[in-house]
Amino acid sequence: MTRLTFWVALLLLLPGAQPAAPEAVSLLGKPLFPAPIAAEARRTLEENLKNAEIVYGRNPDDPDATIWIGRRVAYPGRYREAIEHFSDGVEKHPDDARMYRHRGHRYITVRDFPKAIGDLSKAASLIAGKPDQIEPDGQPNARNMPTSTLNSNIYYHLGLAHYLSGDFAKAADAYQRCLEFSKNPDMLAATTYWYYLALARLGRSTDANALLARITPEMDIIENASYHRLLRMYKGELTADSLLALASGAGLDAVTTRYGVAAWHLTNGRKDQGVALLREIVDGYPQQWPAFGYVAAEADVARAR
């Protein structure tokens, strides 16, 4: 019996349990279900998904329709269904890098890192020598201004999949490539953050610190403020306590910040403090399980067992 089958069987025995299977099993062996969504946000997600379903129903062979229904299905937490849509896209459009890019992302979400690496590596091979393109946002930021591109997202997620697998050297290589396509402050901050951590985990502190030269307080950050603040902390411009106090809620920023501080402790010889924060993330923020910082904390805890 697999871990997933075991947990489904156990949950079905509980009074009032829902029959739905978990979307994934954590690296620590726990079933992972979609987090509750506020009513207003859910209505918006459902309306957007309904529109995507209509477009897809009319154009099932259109690659854009396939991508959007896969993305819209994933936003409420239906990651397995999203993977099925992207797999259909891979079958119909095997030379479209976008299908592998999006499926690879969702393989990361469900903790299948080998498949994520396979898809994202394939995507990287398909974009070789081709011009980059802006990737439209499914959940636009405050300025309705996309901050990433197809190429940057492919290498960003490939680096992350390697990082989560504990292969920090390959993660660093991917993020070095990602920097070539990180053309705005938000993407520069996000890429530099994970690249810095990968180098730090390799003991390459001089190389890691050299990356921070491009990070300044004046950067016009739209959506990656947590990464930007963490990089400034690594530079010595901000304190860990001030960042943790600022991210004291229960949302994504809290997990992102705590992981960034935990990794900083771990790579600077403060293992006990780092591990304590990792446990705080895993035990205290279960509804944030799809967040990259949460997955990274889970991976670090799992490797240490």
Regions found by a protein language model. Give the residues of each.
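Short coil turns that delineate tetratricopeptide repeat
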Residues: 60, 94, 128, 149, ...
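Residue-level recognition of tetratricopeptide repeat
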Residues: 71, 105, 160, 197-200, ...
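N-terminal leader/linker segments that initiate helical-solenoid repeat arrays
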Residues: 18-64, 68, 305
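Canonical positions in the second alpha-helix
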Residues: 54-55, 88-89, 122-123, 144, ...
